Amino acid sequence: MNFAVLPPEVNSARIFAGAGLGPMLAAASAWDGLAEELHAAAGSFASVTTGLAGDAWHGPASLAMTRAASPYVGWLNTAAGQAAQAAGQARLAASAFEATLAATVSPAMVAANRTRLASLVAANLLGQNAPAIAAAEAEYEQIWAQDVAAMFGYHSAASAVATQLAPIQEGLQQQLQNVLAQLASGNLGSGNVGVGNIGNDNIGNANIGFGNRGDANIGIGNIGDRNLGIGNTGNWNIGIGITGNGQIGFGKPANPDVLVVGNGGPGVTALVMGGTDSLLPLPNIPLLEYAARFITPVHPGYTATFLETPSQFFPFTGLNSLTYDVSVAQGVTNLHTAIMAQLAAGNEVVVFGTSQSATIATFEMRYLQSLPAHLRPGLDELSFTLTGNPNRPDGGILTRFGFSIPQLGFTLSGATPADAYPTVDYAFQYDGVNDFPKYPLNVFATANAIAGILFLHSGLIALPPDLASGVVQPVSSPDVLTTYILLPSQDLPLLVPLRAIPLLGNPLADLIQPDLRVLVELGYDRTAHQDVPSPFGLFPDVDWAEVAADLQQGAVQGVNDALSGLGLPPPWQPALPRLF
């Protein structure tokens, strides 16, 4: 289990509301009792057999009995020693739990933080509580990190205890029974399931080799029936990596998962993850090429490889798909394993995350931050590139709204750390996942952001990113490790359905877009520090005289754009209104 994706409400509750030390200490006592009984049984058995052989019973039969009894005495003594070891391990587990209990934040403190945050948000009518809200969120992230560190420490200690515990040895007759069972089934080797297999780990009948699944396969890792070779899927194939039936030769690789950019590094690997599965998911190579547009400005040479994550969100990706929390948790596990493997190989790592995988990157950053300095990668070894980040501190939909939906397995995940590792966070203007309005009571801005989720974030309208027009947004300190870039959108997503109307759709959209953009932008604060988590507010501070001037200018611009779209000369040439 990856505890980094679980909020402190869950981790703290599990520790404080669980069974506690009692069962572990009871188990230790029970193992001690078993060890004493086994030692006593061994001593009694040895005493009886020795007494018989030394007093009344002599000759070949007595000698045979003594030799037969000796292994049983040894087995009893060994089992007694293992029971005593199990008792000691149970006490170590109890000690690990006791230390974890002391290091975990109490549920009462977690609840107090959430209650204080809710009160501050409810009373934040004019934004006066923004600093206190940010402080409460920062405290909550510290609580989260402390709980994660405690749980991972407990998991490591418990795993070490379990690893050190030797398995209780089998009875003296068990090995003979295993051999007889293998012979009865006609299998030769280990791990075979079925009849007549020769080799290891075959499942089926009459397979020869290793890891085959099916019947009458010869080779390694074949799936199906009567295949000859390695890694074939189907029936009656001869060769390597074939998919199908009755084929001979070599299978064509499916979708390559590697893209070399520039000189390939060397020694620089980009781990590229996709977003939540959609109706039109990108194949691996197009996804790698898409990611390269964002990674290359900072890293001109690297080797990009696709990293598989579940990318599911029940029920939107299917009724049999994983919940968002479980999907993210598995993704974090995959990402952390891949990062550690690349670092162990001596490579610098760049992580690319978009949409759900940006949340995965967020949890990985938090987990690495919770580790001691000597156990986590250095700032020169690991960096991140994010797009469509729902956890963006200012604008991410999961940061704007502090909500969870337990029925769907969807838990609030908070803001992406701004000071964990060098990061470039790209946001697409008006994509509601990463650029949701700060003032959602502005119905124009909110409706436009929802349309942005539908048309921009989903990929239904594929717009190539114009990185040259990106605007670097302000941060609170030059020491912040994250660079935030906003990529402007020339058209409002809200007008996409109108533009789909033949002939008059585009001119009508051009007519109203400049003024509508002015109204939409009232829902945003483009001067806010992007590294500071910013929940929603109610009413912006507006200079209505400036708004009136922008609307007047937008009306003129709208007429010009509409006439231009119809092929008519515009009557005025005003300056373009501000995009943001």
UniProtKB/Swiss-Prot annotation:
Residues annotated as domain PE-PPE: 300-525
Organism domain of life: Bacteria
UniProt xrefs under SUPFAM superfamilies: PE/PPE dimer-like (SSF140459)
Gene Ontology annotations of biological process type: response to host immune response; symbiont-mediated perturbation of host innate immune response
Stored Pfam families: PE-PPE, PPE
Similarity field: Belongs to the mycobacterial PPE family.
Functional note: Elicits a high humoral and a low T-cell response. Could be involved in directing the host toward development of a more humoral type of immune response.
Protein name, entry field: Uncharacterized PPE family protein PPE42
Organism of derivation: Mycobacterium tuberculosis (strain ATCC 25618 / H37Rv)
Phylogenetic classification of the source organism: Bacteria, Bacillati, Actinomycetota, Actinomycetes, Mycobacteriales
